[in-house]
């Protein structure tokens, strides 16, 4: 297999944390996304591990844009063996009424959250099939405590669980595993932010937990783990891993 990993999305916390952990494990890394607010720092730190790191702009919900991005990754590094795609629940307009129009907006928000996973996995699977070995890891971010993304977090998570299981079955014969990493805290249980602890700043700790799990899933020891939803704590008062 090649030692190249693609990390799509992930913002300022999860994506960089995963990229650095993969680099420490001997992977060259390509960062895919539409914005790179902290990319320079991530690139420098990856290079400190003696690995290469490139940033490739792509609209992750657009199949053509992602296909072009993967082509650039192949040119700059090589065909990837690992794909990590990070997504999060989408916000809804404040004061949304309970009617058919509101339902359609909720469906749209859920589709908007799920679309990048489908697009990136479709593009990445084609690359992994060539190697007859691969790891696909889908990461969903915790709901924002200051917004209303908790309202879409449960349907997004349910959709990702179903997709993960289906993709794992489809790709099993090719030596590719597919797993989901999701928050273990109450943000994933479709509860309002009022139920969460005050002053909760969990982005960094969750990112570290995701990076830790990713490191294990890309290892040969995890060859038999596929189609699973692994829950990671997003707060210090929740155990790091919780069995689903």
From Swiss-Prot:
GO terms for biological process: novobiocin biosynthetic process. Pathway: Antibiotic biosynthesis; novobiocin biosynthesis. InterPro entries: NAD(P)-bd_dom_sf, SDR, SDR_fam. It comes from the Bacteria. The keyword NADP applies. Keywords: Antibiotic biosynthesis, NADP. The keyword 4Fe-4S does not apply. PANTHER family: 3-OXOACYL-(ACYL-CARRIER-PROTEIN) REDUCTASE, 3-OXOACYL-[ACYL-CARRIER-PROTEIN] REDUCTASE FABG. Belongs to the short-chain dehydrogenases/reductases (SDR) family. Non-catalytic subunit of the NovJ(2)K(2) heterotetramer that catalyzes the NADPH-dependent reduction of the tyrosyl moiety of L-beta-OH-Tyr-S-NovH intermediate to yield the tethered beta-ketotyrosyl-S-NovH in the novobiocin biosynthesis pathway. Novobiocin is an aminocoumarin family antibiotic that targets bacterial DNA gyrases. Heterotetramer; the NovJ(2)K(2) heterotetramer is composed of subunits of 2 NovJ and 2 subunits of NovK. This is Short-chain dehydrogenase/reductase family member NovK. It comes from Streptomyces niveus.
């Amino acid at each position: 297999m090649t030692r190249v990993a693609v990390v799509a999305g992930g913002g300022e916390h999860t994506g960089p944390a995963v990229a650095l952990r993969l680099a420490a494990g001997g992977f060259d890394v390509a960062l895919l996304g539409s914005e790179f607010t902290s990319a320079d720092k991530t690139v420098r730190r990856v290079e400190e591990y003696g690995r290469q790191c490139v940033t490739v702009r792509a609209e992750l919900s657009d199949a053509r844009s992602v296909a072009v991005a993967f082509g650039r990754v192949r040119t700059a590094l090589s065909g990837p063996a690992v794909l990590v795609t990070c997504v999060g629940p989408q916000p809804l307009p404040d004061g949304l009424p309970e009617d058919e129009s509101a339902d359609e907006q909720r469906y749209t928000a859920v589709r908007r959250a799920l679309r990048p996973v489908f697009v990136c996995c479709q593009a990445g699977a084609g690359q992994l099939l060539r190697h007859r070995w691969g790891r696909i890891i889908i990461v969903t971010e915790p709901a924002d405590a200051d917004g209303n993304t908790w309202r879409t977090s449960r349907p997004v998570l349910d959709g990702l669980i179903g997709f993960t299981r289906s993709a794992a079955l489809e790709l099993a014969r090719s030596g590719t595993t597919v797993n989901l990493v999701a928050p273990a805290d109450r943000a994933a249980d479709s509860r309002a932010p009022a139920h969460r602890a005050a002053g909760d700043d969990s982005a960094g700790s969750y990112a570290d937990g995701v990076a830790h799990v990713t490191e294990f899933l890309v290892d040969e020891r995890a060859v038999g783990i596929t189609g699973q939803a692994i829950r990671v704590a997003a707060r210090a008062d929740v155990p790091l891993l919780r069995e689903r």
